[in-house]
Amino acid sequence: MNDLLLAEGIAKSFGTNRVLRGITLAVGRGEVVGLFGPNGSGKTTLANIISGLILPDRGRIRFEGKDVTRMTMDARFRAGIAQTFQIPDPYPSLTVVESVRVALLCGQPARQAGGKEKGGLEEELDSLLLRTGLFAQRFWPAAKLSQGCLRRLEFARAISCRPRLILLDEVFSALSARDEAELVALMRALHREAGISFLLISHNPLILEELCDRVVAIEDGRVFWEGRPGDLAKYVPAANHAHGHEAETGEEGQG
């Protein structure tokens, strides 16, 4: 596989709690990889290490063949690694356009590498807000947004650096059916039109089956299964249980 991202032997502890125990995970160019596991399995910690939000105790992160293990989160963002968070938007007091502008300025080198000049900042902002369906809410403070609009804001901020890889942490959780469908369509368009790779963290096997090329299942800080999305429920008991529960109730569990 032509790996865009390779995380090798990643270990992380918080005090005496060993969260990750030598995980290795790869994402190919243009690939959508699902990351499945129960609460506390280390999914979010792994994403935070890949994005540079936290550093590993041991292991190495390579992105486009370059060792980025000690790079800051801002530097990785400029290099093309973006992340959305389970609890959206770090700037609740900013308006939508202000929040996206912060991300766009942070990603300025990547934006210019894509052929944009500084004078096009406002045009780029408008384009991002139109693409993510937030133009009408551009002057709203983030604290006033619905859950669906907050997820859109996370997407707008993430794609502002023209990323090669986006880490999506439970981005489809706690959404209405309409919001989920629209965000799925946005993700697919970004994948199809821009060739963006995704690492999609979800406790919902139906979402993983629908969107992913491959799924990696982790538990207790280790990879214990990897394969085709359609085989997840056959080999992973937690996925089989979740699959049946969602089929019966139409609801997602907490994950």
Q: Predicted regions span which residues?
A:
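Catalytic Walker B motif of ABC-type/P-loop ATPase nucleotide-binding domains
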Residues: 166-169
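A short, surface-exposed alpha-helical micro-motif characterized by mixed small hydrophobic
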Residues: 208-210
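Helix-to-loop junction immediately C-terminal to a conserved catalytic motif
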Residues: 51
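Conserved ABC ATPase "signature" region
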Residues: 116-137, 185
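H-loop/switch region of ABC-family ATPase nucleotide-binding domains
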Residues: 202-203
